[in-house]
């Protein structure tokens, strides 16, 4: 099989990751519709928008506990669990790079969630998107659970 993920697609994935990193999503007091705080709810809303834009079917729990995006058909579900919360950034003055920007240096992305778990979640999502773009038919559902 030829390269499935092109350089342009990789750049697009990094831009999406930067977009998601820009949403501060550390645990805050619960609010109505945001059981883990407004930041985490905002990250869930943004992730669902991203998944919609990429062609996934989405569902978001109205109470804000979870959402998912899926592709494929059939009775079986292959689940990919991702989380969008991060630890607080602490003293912003001690950061070399803005923790909520998603700074790319030498092909590495710096920012809250870039390694745990926003970055890996976007990588997995784009791997499936690349297969979708190649016309691959999934005979079971692949569900990304957030």
What are these regions (language model features)?
Residues 77-146:
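Active-site metal-coordination/substrate-binding segment of hydrolases
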């Amino acid at each position: 099989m030829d390269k499935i993920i092109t350089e342009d697609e990789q750049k697009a994935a990094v831009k999406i990751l930067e977009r998601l990193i820009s949403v501060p999503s550390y645990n805050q007091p619960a609010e109505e519709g945001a059981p883990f705080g407004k930041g985490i709810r905002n990250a869930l809303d943004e992730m669902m928008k991203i998944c919609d834009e990429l062609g996934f079917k989405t569902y978001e729990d109205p109470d804000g506990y979870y959402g998912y995006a899926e592709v494929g058909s059939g009775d079986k579900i292959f689940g990919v669990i991702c989380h969008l919360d991060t630890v607080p950034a602490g003293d912003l003055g001690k950061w070399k790079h803005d923790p909520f920007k998603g700074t790319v240096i030498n092909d590495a992305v710096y920012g809250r969630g870039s390694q745990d778990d926003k970055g890996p979640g976007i990588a997995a999502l784009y791997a499936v998107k690349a297969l979708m773009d190649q016309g691959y038919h999934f005979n079971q559902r692949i569900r990304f659970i957030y």
